[in-house]
């Protein structure tokens, strides 16, 4: 019960802190990069991608924005952006690997970092 109450609070805090990014959508025509918008999305991302984005509670990191890079409905990589330095901390595919689109995803996010920066103001 205590854990559920904690998660509810984290969910509310996450929405309060990160909702300004929820309309963000970066695309190069094939790849689309969007923010994770809820703890449920973090959980699903972690399960599908077989990595620790949910279990290590990245939703609690105030200075991180977690993005999901996709082609259609298929998740390709999960991207962590530092909201203080506006640098990509990591971008991981299934099982913490890299995808064939890794460099393209990095370029897409870096190219649009000014947009992310503008949303933090």
For each feature predicted by the language model, list its residue ranges:
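Catalytic-core elements of nucleic-acid end-processing and repair enzymes
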Residues: 1-121
């Amino acid at each position: 019960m205590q854990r559920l109450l904690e998660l509810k609070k984290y969910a509310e805090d996450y929405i309060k802190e990160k909702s300004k990014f929820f309309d963000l959508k970066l695309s190069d025509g094939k790849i689309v990069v969007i923010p994770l918008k809820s703890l449920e999305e973090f959980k699903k991302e972690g399960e599908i991608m077989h990595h620790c984005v949910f279990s290590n509670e990245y939703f609690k990191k105030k200075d991180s924005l977690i993005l999901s890079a996709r082609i259609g409905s298929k998740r390709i990589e999960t991207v962590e952006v530092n909201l203080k330095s506006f640098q990509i901390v990591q971008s991981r595919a299934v099982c913490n690997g890299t995808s064939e689109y890794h460099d393209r995803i990095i370029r897409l996010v870096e190219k649009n970092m000014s947009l992310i920066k503008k949303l933090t103001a």
